[in-house]
From Swiss-Prot:
HAMAP family: MsrA. Keywords: Oxidoreductase. The gene is msrA. It comes from Pseudomonas putida (strain W619). It holds the Pfam family PMSR. This is Peptide methionine sulfoxide reductase MsrA.
């Protein structure tokens, strides 16, 4: 049996539900509006376009969120924690390795302007999905690669794009993709200061970086 004290030393070990921190019932307080999109409610309601949601984990959520809010067709972004056990965790608890969560970006997008396949292409190309419980210099379960799908169609498209990107990675000499692909669990939103962090702190840390491998244009959903 792995003890909590041992997990604190080795953050590459996923805790069990019994080992995870208990968390709390109260969610984090969030600002009403998106810091970048100004008049757009952070969590809706969204009245324009054909709205859908995507959930991606690709390392530190500060840099990941910025890349997605810069994409045309994205109408809102929120960062949070998902895939673990602890309800409504704090950032410090997630960093301890004792929640099981990974850092994620909830992407709200207009399907008439950007497709899920296009967002998947961004996801694969923005980070290295072969690194297991780390992303670059950021090490731990909270930095693992993940796609959490909000519909059966998203799940099918995510797996198909993974297989296509794996073929391209193989050509470039990379290993196997370790990205977790599953139905969407509960996303616990991160503290207010994390939301749109790099818009508030332009010189802040951003550890996101891809492999240089790209999907063929025919598979990018353009």
């Amino acid at each position: 049996m792995v003890l909590r004290s041992e997990i604190l030393v080795n953050k590459n070990v996923m805790p069990t539900a019994e080992q995870a921190l208990p968390g709390r019932e109260t969610p984090m307080s969030l600002p009403e509006f998106h810091y970048v999109f100004k008049d757009t409610p952070l969590l809706g309601p969204f009245f324009e376009g054909s709205i859908d949601f995507a959930i991606f984990g690709l390392g530190c959520f500060w840099g990941a969120e910025r890349r997605f809010w810069q994409r045309e067709g994205v109408v809102s972004t929120v960062v949070g924690y998902a895939g673990g056990f602890t309800p409504n965790p704090t950032y410090e608890e997630v960093c301890s390795g004792l929640t099981g969560h990974t850092e994620v970006v909830l992407v709200v997008f207009d399907k008439d302007k950007v497709s899920y396949r296009e967002l998947l292409a961004m996801f694969w190309e923005l980070h290295n999905p072969t690194q297991g419980m780390r992303q670059g210099n950021d090490v731990g379960t909270q930095y693992r690669s993940a796609i959490y799908c909000t519909s059966p169609q998203q799940l099918e498209e995510a797996k198909a794009s993974r297989d296509a990107f794996q073929a391209e990675l193989n050509k470039a000499g990379y290993g196997e993709i370790t990205t977790e692909i599953d139905q969407a669990p509960t996303v616990y939103f991160a503290e207010a200061y994390h939301q749109q962090y790099l818009a508030k702190n332009p010189d802040g840390y951003c550890g996101i970086g891809g492999t240089g491998v790209c999907l063929p244009p025919s598979l990018q959903g353009n």
